Swiss-Prot record:
It comes from Mycobacterium phage L5. This is Gene 47 protein.
Length: 69
């Protein structure tokens, strides 16, 4: 899986994470699935929006600009 990024905007902050978004409407959660098989779950009531938007190259540039490893 390529390292594309998903931006998740919550009520009080935002996250940019390298993962595939999965919306589970029955459970009311947004799941971000990572390459290593783990995931992060967001309560849908707190999510304002999400967008699967960065290519792998754009995400790597974003990480370099933010000083992430």
């Amino acid at each position: 899986m390529a390292r594309r990024a998903t931006a998740v905007t919550l009520e009080d902050r935002f996250h940019v994470v390298a993962g595939e978004p999965i919306l589970d409407t029955q459970e009311g959660v947004l799941i971000i699935a990572f390459d290593d098989g783990t995931s992060r779950t967001f309560n849908w009531d707190k999510v304002v929006d999400y967008y699967y938007y960065m290519t792998e190259d754009e995400y790597e540039q974003f990480r370099r600009e933010r000083g992430a490893e």
